[in-house]
């Protein structure tokens, strides 16, 4: 009889309703907050991941890209897929790596075609006009290298690696 009396309060405590104010993600049985990549599955599934070229459950690589491909079961590394870190030479650079929070905000307008024209051609046109080196149609008698470019050549030069178009 004494045992029954002890069991009843325990049963009543289990039936109480509670309100949880914490997030569902903080729960005891929530495994979403743990990264368990490549840990789940049977031995058969893990062996299939290792041996098959296209396994039913892909191996999670945690964001690292392959630097090659599988050809006839052999891994062939492709040099173009290996990332290169290009570090510019900053000797003689007057810019400092740290910008103070007290520095004023710099607002720059959008770079337009007029700005590009003024940066590249305007000075040469003004000098040619003052020196009288313009023809009757307004073109230069002695054109510069940039003025001699055709539209196709200018587009090709702008798309070339190392240009500051992007």
From Swiss-Prot:
Main location: mitochondrion
A GO molecular-function annotation: structural constituent of ribosome
Keyword terms: Mitochondrion, Ribonucleoprotein, Ribosomal protein, Transit peptide
Residue stretch of the organelle transit peptide: 1-26
Stretches the record annotates as Disordered: 136-166
UniProt cross-references to Pfam families, sorted A to Z: MRP-L27 (PF09809)
UniProt entry tagged with the keyword Flavoprotein: no
GO process annotations (BP): mitochondrial translation; translation
Family of this protein: Belongs to the mitochondrion-specific ribosomal protein mL41 family.
Quaternary structure, from the entry: Component of the mitochondrial ribosome large subunit (39S) which comprises a 16S rRNA and about 50 distinct proteins.
PANTHER family named in the record: LARGE RIBOSOMAL SUBUNIT PROTEIN ML41, MITOCHONDRIAL RIBOSOMAL PROTEIN L41
Descriptive protein name: Large ribosomal subunit protein mL41
Source organism of this protein record: Drosophila melanogaster (Fruit fly)
Chain's gene name: mRpL41
């Amino acid at each position: 009889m004494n045992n029954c009396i002890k069991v009843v309060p325990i049963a009543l405590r289990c039936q109480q309703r509670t309100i949880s104010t914490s997030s569902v993600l903080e729960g005891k049985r929530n495994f979403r907050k743990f990264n368990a990549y490549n840990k789940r599955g049977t031995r058969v599934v893990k062996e299939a991941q290792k041996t098959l070229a296209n396994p039913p459950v892909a191996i999670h690589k945690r964001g690292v890209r392959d630097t090659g491909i599988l050809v006839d079961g052999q891994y062939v590394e492709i040099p173009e897929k290996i990332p290169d870190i290009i570090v510019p030479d900053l000797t003689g650079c007057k810019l400092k790596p740290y910008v103070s929070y007290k520095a004023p905000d710099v607002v720059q307008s959008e770079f337009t075609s007029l700005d590009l024209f003024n940066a590249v051609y305007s000075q040469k046109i003004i000098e040619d006009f003052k020196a009288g080196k313009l023809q009757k149609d307004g073109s230069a008698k002695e054109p510069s290298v940039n003025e001699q470019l055709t539209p196709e050549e200018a587009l090709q030069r702008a798309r070339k690696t190392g240009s500051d178009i992007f």
